[in-house]
Structures are given as C-alpha cells and as structure tokens.
Amino acid sequence: MFTPVEAKKSNLITVGRITGVFGIKGWVKLKSFTDPQDNVLEYSPLLLKTKHGVKECEIAEYQFRPQGLVVRLKGVDDRNAAEALAPVDVAIDKSLLPELDDDDFYWHQLEGLRVVTIYEGNTQDLGVVSKVMATGANDVLEVKPDAQSIDDRDRLVPYVLDLYVKKVDLSAECITVDWDPEF
C-alpha cells in the first residue's frame, strides 16, 4: 500500500494532518497547515508520519467539502484502510518548498531561534522561539525562556519587520527585535 522511506527528521516539514475518515470508500479528512490551504495538494510525494515509521503516499483524488478538504490516497480503497491512517501527521521533504525572497522565512526556519532585544539600547536575551502563530493582523513569535534568558517569562512578540523585528540571521540562529522586555 505505502512505500517506507528513510526518515531524516531534520528534512521533514509537517504540512497537514489526517484527522479522520470520510465515507466508506477510503477517503480521509485532511487538515492542511499550508497557506493557502490547497497548497498541500501541490506536494508529491506526501509522507505519513506513522507510529511504524514514515510512509510515502500520493493523493489519488481530492474534494473541498463543507467539512473541509477530503482526499483519497492511492492504495486506500475502503473505510477500514482509511481508519488505520487517522490520526497521522502529513509531511514533505524540505527540498520541495519553493525558494523565498531574502526577507521572507518559513515558520519552521524561525522556530528554535534565539530572540535578543535591543530595546532602548540594552541588549537582552528573551529566550527561544517555540512556535509562530497567525493572528490575522500579523504573525506572532511565541518566545519561551531558557537558561540564557533574562527571566523565566513567556513572551509574545509581533513579527512585524522593521518595526519590532530588526534582523533575522539564520546562520547565527538569532532574531534581533526592538521589544520592551517588560511585555
């Protein structure tokens, strides 16, 4: 049914999640984490991160339903086979992602970077980006403290280039912000 692939965790990016089954003919509900949501359909092969390892698969058919995106994977032809898949994360190899402009970054590139503020000329370590959230107005960095940070507070820093985010240096694994550490 699926081809096992060698898992190189650092090369896999989660782009969605199979959340349940739809109907009796092997269709599954696919929650896409891409923006726009239908971008998940552009990637092939998809990699299912199962408890038995990473399995390669391809989408045979898809439909947009009121309940969301539903797909039928090649080799999954009945409800029993579909039930064996849910819930499972759906990933792709990083190499499938398109190149971005110099000042654009994928969220996974920002996660794990150290955040340093230069607020009022004082350089202080705020912690590490644990995740990035979409809020509608702008993305927000969730910064968690660690042994190097100035205190043990969690912080939410708006990802607004030039205003708050002054520099993202992937090679130095650091984001420089101008953010009041009291917030």
Curated annotation (Swiss-Prot):
Keyword Amino-acid biosynthesis attached: no
Subunit structure as annotated in this protein's UniProt entry: Binds ribosomal protein uS19.
Source organism of this protein record: Saccharophagus degradans (strain 2-40 / ATCC 43961 / DSM 17024)
Subcellular location: Cytoplasm
Keyword rRNA processing found: yes
Protein name: Ribosome maturation factor RimM
Role: An accessory protein needed during the final step in the assembly of 30S ribosomal subunit, possibly for assembly of the head region. Essential for efficient processing of 16S rRNA. May be needed both before and after RbfA during the maturation of 16S rRNA. It has affinity for free ribosomal 30S subunits but not for 70S ribosomes.
GO molecular function: ribosome binding
Gene Ontology terms: cellular component: cytoplasm; ribosome
Domain PRC barrel: 102-183
Pfam short name (any one): PRC_RimM
Family per record: Belongs to the RimM family.
The record's note on its domains: The PRC barrel domain binds ribosomal protein uS19.
Domain of life: Bacteria
Keywords: Chaperone, Cytoplasm, Ribosome biogenesis, rRNA processing
Any one GO biological process: ribosomal small subunit biogenesis
